[in-house]
Amino acid sequence: MPCKRCRPSVYSLSYIKRGKTRNYLYPIWSPYAYYLYCYKYRITLREKMLPRCYKSITYKEEEDLTLQPRSCLQCSESLVGLQEGKSTEQGNHDQLKELYSAGNLTVLATDPLLHQDPVQLDFHFRLTSQTSAHWHGLLCDRRLFLDIPYQALDQGNRESLTATLEYVEEKTNVDSVFVNFQNDRNDRGALLRAFSYMGFEVVRPDHPALPPLDNVIFMVYPLERDVGHLPSEPP
């Protein structure tokens, strides 16, 4: 019996899957404790009628990993991050887009099309023509968690944090900025004094916005917002 159907049928399905998975290169209290991923799948079905009416079906699936966590050789307070950052820094940098640049501060963020909760933000502050200070953070539910850079008490890092806080206050709708460090650090007292001087406050361990961790000190910089406040350039 001849086949009445001569044209091939093509069916295509595309969908995006987002989520996070544990990044064991960083401790659980770090903003980079999880990989953020965004997979794009495309499944194509081709149906072709052969002389005896048998079906030939082909499936094609494409997977695109579009987002991974940042690891920076210059910036990470984690020793593992310092060791591993060199090999991944360039690849991760390519996944960030410039969001803002003025004076010595440049802000990078994940692709706006991939924005989800949380969102990755990087703050680069130029100190000289060849050096810069970096603060890497995750924006989650109007809270910004900053990773403390290596040698956080250096004058350059303090200047860069001031510029970062000014940007966050003026250009975003963030309500609180968090930093954290180990309770048993040798420079714990110096960190407490330095961040307190800049307006940070120690957060109680049972604060609902924090993970239930031991031996970790969280400090928060609260931003007082006026009613009806709208950021001029939201991330």
Curated annotation (Swiss-Prot):
Family membership noted in the UniProt record? Belongs to the ODC antizyme family.
**One BP term from GO:** viral translational frameshifting
Pfam families noted in UniProt: ODC_AZ (PF02100)
Gene3D superfamilies linked: 3.40.630.60
Tissues with expression: Testis specific.
Q: In its UniProt entry, what is this protein called? A: Ornithine decarboxylase antizyme 3
Q: What does this protein do?
A: Ornithine decarboxylase (ODC) antizyme protein that negatively regulates ODC activity and intracellular polyamine biosynthesis and uptake in response to increased intracellular polyamine levels. Binds to ODC monomers, inhibiting the assembly of the functional ODC homodimers. Does not target the ODC monomers for degradation, which allows a protein synthesis-independent restoration of ODC activity. Stabilizes AZIN2 by interfering with its ubiquitination. Involved in the translocation of AZNI2 from ER-Golgi intermediate compartment (ERGIC) to the cytosol.
Domain of life, per UniProt, equals Eukaryota
Where is this chain's protein located in or outside the cell? Nucleus; Cytoplasm
Assigned GO CC terms? blood microparticle; cytoplasm; cytosol; nucleoplasm; nucleus; sperm flagellum
**Which PANTHER family does the record associate with it?**
ORNITHINE DECARBOXYLASE ANTIZYME (PTHR10279), ORNITHINE DECARBOXYLASE ANTIZYME 3 (PTHR10279:SF9)
Report the source organism: Homo sapiens (Human)
Q: Which residues carry this modification: Phosphoserine?
A: 9, 12
* This protein's UniProt keywords: Cytoplasm, Nucleus, Phosphoprotein, Polyamine biosynthesis
Give the InterPro entries listed for this entry.
Answer: Acyl_CoA_acyltransferase (IPR016181), ODC_AZ (IPR002993), ODC_AZ_sf (IPR038581)
SUPFAM superfamilies, per the entry: Acyl-CoA N-acyltransferases (Nat)
A molecular function GO annotation: ornithine decarboxylase inhibitor activity
Could you give the subunit structure recorded for this chain? Interacts with ODC1 and thereby sterically blocks ODC homodimerization. Interacts with AZIN2; this interaction disrupts the interaction between the antizyme and ODC1. Interacts with GGN.
